[in-house]
Amino acid sequence: MSFFTNLRRVNKLYPNQASFLADNTRLLTSTPAGFTNVLNAPSVRNLGNNRYQPGYQLSNNRFVSTSDINRITRNNDVPNIRNVFQGISDPQINSLRQLRRMDNVPDFHYHTKQTRSNAVRQNFPETNVRTPEGVQNALQQNPRLHNHMRTLKVAGVGILLAGGGYLLFTASTLVQDIINAINRTGGSYYVQGRNAGENVESCLLLQRTCRQDRNLAQSDVNICSRDPLLANDSPLLTNMCQGFNYETEKTVCRGSNPAANPNSPQYVDISDLPAGQTIMCIEPYSFSDLVGDLGLDWLLGREGLVGKSSNSSDGIRNKIMPIIMMIGAVLFLGLILYFIYRYMTKGGGGGGGSGGAPTPIVIMQHPASTTAPRR
């Protein structure tokens, strides 16, 4: 079996340490170079009630779980990969790309979009909004983004979002289209990779989604017809959201995060799913998440700053231009008066006294010779 298939198999709790060691031996046979130094040090944490969380003991005595190894390698989370696999080279990290393609692993697309959304939220805090007023303000502060999204609305083509739902241009205003798209996001999603993981198919798992936006129109979201792990009438599924408290749990899902604390209601064991499939919880979007999902972050900020600078320059220019023109007029008038003065002092005014007459030039002649001619 492939590396990511074997890695998925150990992403679960074990009844004893020996069972994990046997599965980890199988995993090592498919582990690429650069990763064996960590996977050669299997360990477990005793959670009680005959439950053992599998993982690995790092050289600094830190424990890293198999769920974390799955998460960072499937997401192509390079900073955390380097943090766990000390001394790993770029070619060794890049070798995971082909292995992900072999198994149609889709996770890295979501991780890339989430990383981009986090950067948008941090660098442009005005986009971290979910209200019409907030969205309108963010668009006004980012005119290039505003113009681009107006162009999309004119084209009228719906866009499928990674976070579930669609951005549809059917409302009377662009702002309302954006709010409607935000309201369609959030929930537990069953995701399947296609075409080497470059494309995905996803659907909303309603019974694992414990908090839905009251404005959600289910006709605008692809609802799963079945749960990938449990029968639709299973009490474990139908009662999954019983006692849910969003203020305490800080997430809209249960049973949707394979990397969650195994003792929390958010944890799910997906070790039986193929490597190209996963279950994930996507929290409701803000405008920053929508911008990151659409890959429109390059339209933020720069044009707004240029526009503000241009507007500021125009204002300054309009204020100082009359002053510049006045100074120019005074200098021009002074130049004319100077030439008039020069003309008058050089005698250009006609007749007058001797003061204006030229000084006579006297030419001295030599006297004639007085010597008599010789006879």
Curated annotation (Swiss-Prot):
Keyword annotations of the record: Glycoprotein, Late protein, Membrane, Transmembrane, Transmembrane helix, Viral envelope protein, Virion
The record describes its membrane topology as: Multi-pass membrane protein
What InterPro entries does UniProt report for this protein, alphabetically?
A: Baculo_ODV-E56
Alphabetical GO CC annotations of the entry are: membrane; viral envelope; virion membrane
Highest taxon, organism lineage:
Viruses
The record's similarity note reads: Belongs to the baculoviridae E56 family.
Supply the name of the protein: Occlusion-derived virus envelope protein E56
* Organism for this UniProt entry: Bombyx mori nuclear polyhedrosis virus (BmNPV)
